[in-house]
Amino acid sequence: MAPPALRPENAIRRADELVSVGEPMAALQSLFDLLSSRRSRFADAATLEPIIFKFLELGVELRKGKMIKEGLYQYKKHMQHTPEGLISVGAVARKFIDLIETKMTNIQAQTDAKEESNKDQAEEDLEGGVTPENLLVSVYEQEQTVGGFNNDDVSAWLRFTWESYRTTLDFLRNNSQLEITYAGVVNRTMQFCYKYNRKNEFKRLAEMLRQHLDAANYQQQRYGHHTVDLSDPDTLQRYSDQRFQQVNVSVKLELWHEAFRSIEDVHHLMRLSKRAPKPSVLANYYENLAKIFFVSGNYLLHAAAWEKFYNLYLKNPNASEEDFKFYSSQFVLSALAIQLDDLPIAGFDPQIRLCDLLDLESKPKRKDLITAAGEQQVVEKADADILKFFNILETNFDVKSAKSQLSALLPNLVEKPYFAQYVAPLRNLFIRRSIIEVSKAQTSIHLVELHEMLSLPAPFELSVFELEKYLIQAAMDDYVSISIDHETDTVSFAQDPFDAWQASLVEVPESSTSDEAKNSESEEETSQETHADEEQNEQVFTRNSEVRSKLTDLSKILKANEEYENGSYYYRVKLVREELIRRKEEVIKLEKEAAEIRAKSNAERKKRSEEENKILAKKALEERQRRMAEEKAAVESSMEKEAERRAEEMMEREREAIHEQEMKKLIAETNANGVIHIDPKEAKNLTSDKINQMVIEQVAKNKKDLTERMTYAFKKLDHLERAYRQMELPLLEKDAEEQKKRDRENYDNFKKKLIETSKADYEKKLALHQRLNKIYSTFNQYKSSVIAEKKEELEKQRALKEAQLEEAKKQRIEQVRKERYEAKVAEIQAAIEAEAAEKEALAKEEELAKRRAERERINKERDEIARKQREIEELLEKKNGSSRSSPVPSTPTPAPAPAQTAPVSNKPMSMAEKLRLKRMNAGRG
């Protein structure tokens, strides 16, 4: 029975009535029960949509997020089996988000209006409201507004709105029919987080989107019903657009860690996509990446990202001169902010992975980026003051003149909006480059003099303490080697790195032994500590001696190099590090080769061991198989004896069963003929002769009864038929006369109508002939032209068809030849196979004939032995009879009757008969 029809207007009217009497919760519950009921499973989308819309309106008003979630999933469960249902699911999700956003906008507007009114009241009485209690309350409220809001009602609605967005995203996720709706809800959720500054919610949103993408990838490999196909370009483009938007919002909210993770997601999707992203989208990607690298302090990749961005921005037809000036100046400053080239390091450089985000094959160098910043397409659009600053620090850097030039230029640069963020790295560059130049020109300098040389107006001002910090940092980075004497406030520079490193090594003084003798009378704890210090000093001395020895060897090799002798301290350190890295790589290579040799020998040894184990296992298996074969042979021998005994018993039972089965079959055939019916239970007591006799008797009886009945029926039928004909003859004559009259009347009527119709038709045709006779000549001309045209066309078609016919004949001839060849090959193959089969059959027949002849020979021998045995027994009986005194002669033992031979038949034996014959022969043996 079909479920009752669902009427949405009744449910909505019932909900409105409950709301009107102040029971909105009951109205919501009634709609939820209707959505969860069994009737809703069979309803279509058009019927349920008004109900779910009303349900969502009430749920949003009452802030019942959990019930809304359950209702949405119930609706999706009912509708997800058809394309129309999925379209309705998307419409319901969009309606839900519209309701949420509208409600949130209204709440925010009411709150803003209330705050404005409170602000006006506070301005009227500025002092009256300031009390200790109010101050404490305000402080407490500020502590509670970490999320950005101090209104409980607004916060509750914000939480509800966020939960609604999250529910909707989970409701729409990973369904190919809902991709567009899902993408729209994702963008609206990001706008919500940005509008209300919800940083924590945005982090959760980003993590949720990653989980959805992972789940889509997992489901794509296992399921196939409406799953998201990431190989589809449109789908992948939508996911890429979501991640680009995610990066933009992350940067706007200054969530740099989340922005970097989003950048990695974008880069991964761009690699999967076969479509190249739009230049505007790619430019936005590089701009955000530059901001992220700047915040992380990676000025090298920051400048590389600006270079990528600027190269794309040059192709923008809508860009203005002011935009070019801003971005070119930004690129020049980012290139200047890069730290001086790093020294070579051993091991993996973590920045290589970051370079992959910029589609760079290798780590960029400062020199290349400075060259790119000095190209004509950048210089001609950059700010003039920025170019002057660039020339001072890069092109024509001079410590003595740089101070005066920068002092005059810095006030103009401070006014630039893009200069403020690069103050710290640019000041660091200027100070470090100045320190390096001073270290090249002088071996020592007074700290005050150096401070005066590097002091610049704001924002490049520098204190003595900061100067010492910069000196130490430069020394730690191996740009210079310094020693500061605070008594004289002098800074000394070392020119050779080996001298500085050897001086820094710890040396154990020779007086350590004498100190131990002087302190021999100290306490036990003091002596133990001294002994431990001596051991530690001895280890340090040994290690330092080894390091000093290696450095000495390395210095001898490098000092023979002319470039090393003429280079600066920084260049010498670079050469030393390159040489050390080269040597370390050689050592690692040798160790790797040795490890490979050891691994190879271990593998060979393991292989030999496995082969020996295989040989032993094979021998054990052969021995076990031999024992099992012996045991099996013994068991088979006993089983054969038991089988022979059982076979003899079974043979007798089978003889009886075969006889009974044959009789039942014969009885069934006899009963099927319908002549006589015999009970199958009597099969044991009947023979074929008895059954045939019963059938013959029954057939004779039936034939006799039939003859008697036929004779009686023929006599009865003859008299009855004669009486019928005598009675119907006058009636037939009367009917014939009446029929003749009716036929004559019908003929006259038909003839009259035919004459009238023919006259009318003749008149119409005569009028038509006279009308057409006027155009007969024109018709003949048109007919002749059409015939000529069709004749020409017919000739062309005939020629074309003849050509096609000839071509078809050739193809058919070739096909017939090929088919005959294949048939001949198949015939020869079949003949070969038939000959082989015939030979095999002849061989089998010869084998059977040999076995049959051998069996007959054995049977003849046995019969001969039995005959001789009977003769011997008869002779013995005769002897015994003649020697007895009793008048009654003894009856001789009758000879066993010969076995009844079956009638010879040309019909081949069945499988059961062959098995029976085999068992009988075995029993005789």
Curated annotation (Swiss-Prot):
The keyword Coiled coil applies. It is found in: Cytoplasm. GO terms for molecular function: mRNA binding; translation initiation factor activity. SMART domains: PINT. Signal peptide: none annotated. Residues 108-127, 509-544, 839-925 are annotated as: Disordered. Its main location: cytoplasm. GO terms for biological process: formation of cytoplasmic translation initiation complex; translation reinitiation. It comes from the Eukaryota. Residues 534-666, 785-885 form a coiled coil. Residues 112-121, 839-880 have a biased composition (Basic and acidic residues). GO terms for cellular component: eukaryotic 43S preinitiation complex; eukaryotic 48S preinitiation complex; eukaryotic translation initiation factor 3 complex, eIF3e; eukaryotic translation initiation factor 3 complex, eIF3m; multi-eIF complex. Keywords: Coiled coil, Cytoplasm, Initiation factor, Protein biosynthesis, RNA-binding. Pfam families: eIF3a_PCI_TPR-like, PCI. Residues 324-498 form the PCI domain. HAMAP family: eIF3a. Belongs to the eIF-3 subunit A family. RNA-binding component of the eukaryotic translation initiation factor 3 (eIF-3) complex, which is involved in protein synthesis of a specialized repertoire of mRNAs and, together with other initiation factors, stimulates binding of mRNA and methionyl-tRNAi to the 40S ribosome. The eIF-3 complex specifically targets and initiates translation of a subset of mRNAs involved in cell proliferation. Component of the eukaryotic translation initiation factor 3 (eIF-3) complex. This is Eukaryotic translation initiation factor 3 subunit A.
